[in-house]
């Protein structure tokens, strides 16, 4: 895909004013672009770094058209906007990310079928439309398996683990509320992710492979570079995905590595991702920089340089309560507080990145600091 480059001083519209929108806006502004953000929350984080703010719901057609009329290009920070609404916007306005990826990825079943058709390795799965399909899941997948809603759900929401017959009732409850997907539960050795930007003329730029740890289904920590030799294999899988899904901008593919050292594609985030936040300090370009370059039609760097290994820690509300008094004592902690008005224990309130020559020692230091809040 080839499209015109935006000149300095052009206006970028962002649908979604959370922390991702905020960091997109900051990258856009340092490149000389103006930013208009649309979000339903009057005190969303991006509002305070944008040139203009439109307070409206994401399905407010009038407000979305207002955004389109004000901007030379539109991007979005999350995948929960209506795919149909986005398709209509794409017909009238310049939205390089497009709607196709959103349309595919909002449905877990379609996502997995697309990934499988693309030739990537995915965890065995089946469609579960009604309670009787659970028997098929038991027969096909065996215990344990996970039941996930087809639509919605993030940070572990909308899913239940079925270890044995005693857990089936929880699976039935979920199926009563939504069509679902059942997938085999893996004995996971490690979780990794690969952040990628696709730009003008199908330029592809890869970030280093990221090693992730989740706690309570929320990203807890990212280490870069990943301490496992899976970069080439992950890139091969991502290249297959790129051939199957239209997308311009930054996106992330999450992987599982099982106890047999097999790499499986888990899911795709069609926008900058939490596990790529380290790139702001640790790389010569951040994932937000390359995203803005891509959606404005600029050339991408041929490669991303990791300036120094890094450990990135998410900061939840409970972590801020524990660590607030320590931040000033650690200038090596690159701190990002998102500016959310309401602090909740399990809400992402910020992140911090530590550049280090010894990720193992820094990891242990972080465990010691964070253990009181987990």
Curated annotation (Swiss-Prot):
ATP binds at residues 108, 148, 153-159, 183-186, 191, 214, 266-267. Keywords: ATP-binding, Ligase, Nucleotide-binding, Purine biosynthesis. It is an enzyme of class 6 (ligase). GO terms for biological process: 'de novo' IMP biosynthetic process. Residues 112-296 form the ATP-grasp domain. Its EC number is 6.3.4.18. The keyword Ligase applies. Catalyzes the ATP-dependent conversion of 5-aminoimidazole ribonucleotide (AIR) and HCO(3)(-) to N5-carboxyaminoimidazole ribonucleotide (N5-CAIR). This is N5-carboxyaminoimidazole ribonucleotide synthase. It comes from Staphylococcus aureus (strain COL).
């Amino acid at each position: 895909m080839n499209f015109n480059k935006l000149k300095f001083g052009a206006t970028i519209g962002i649908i979604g004013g959370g922390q991702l929108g905020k960091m997109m806006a900051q990258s856009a502004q340092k490149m000389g672009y103006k930013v208009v953000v649309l979000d339903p929350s009057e005190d969303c984080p991006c509002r305070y770094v944008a040139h203009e703010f439109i307070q409206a719901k994401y399905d407010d057609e009038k407000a979305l058209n207002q955004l389109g009329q004000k901007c030379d290009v539109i991007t979005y920070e999350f995948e929960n906007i209506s795919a149909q609404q986005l398709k209509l916007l794409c017909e009238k306005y310049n939205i390089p990310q497009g709607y196709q990826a959103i349309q595919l990825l909002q449905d877990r079943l379609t996502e997995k079928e697309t990934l499988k058709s693309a030739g990537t390795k995915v965890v065995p799965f089946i469609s579960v439309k009604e309670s009787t399909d659970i028997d098929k899941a038991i027969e096909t997948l065996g215990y344990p398996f996970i039941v996930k809603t087809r639509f919605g759900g993030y940070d572990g929401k909308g899913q239940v683990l079925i270890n044995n017959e005693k857990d089936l009732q929880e699976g039935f409850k979920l199926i009563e509320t939504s069509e679902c997907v059942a997938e085999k539960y893996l004995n996971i050795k490690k979780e990794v992710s690969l952040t990628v930007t696709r730009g003008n003329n199908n330029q592809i730029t890869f970030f280093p492979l990221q090693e992730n740890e989740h706690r309570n289904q929320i990203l807890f920590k990212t280490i870069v570079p990943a301490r496992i030799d899976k970069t080439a294999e992950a890139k091969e899988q991502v290249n297959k995905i790129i051939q199957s899904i239209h997308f311009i901008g930054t996106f992330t593919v999450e992987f599982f590595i099982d106890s047999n050292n097999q790499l499986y594609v888990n899911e795709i985030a069609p926008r900058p991702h939490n596990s790529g936040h380290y790139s702001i300090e640790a790389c010569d370009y951040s994932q937000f920089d390359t995203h803005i370059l891509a959606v404005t039609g600029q050339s991408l760097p041929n490669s991303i340089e990791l300036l120094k290994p890094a450990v990135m820690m998410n900061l939840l509300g409970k972590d801020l309560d524990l660590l607030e008094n320590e931040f000033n004592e650690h200038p090596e902690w690159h701190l990002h507080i998102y500016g959310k008005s309401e602090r909740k224990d399990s809400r992402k309130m910020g992140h911090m990145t530590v550049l280090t020559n010894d990720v193992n020692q820094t990891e242990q230091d972080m465990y010691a600091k964070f253990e009181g809040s987990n």
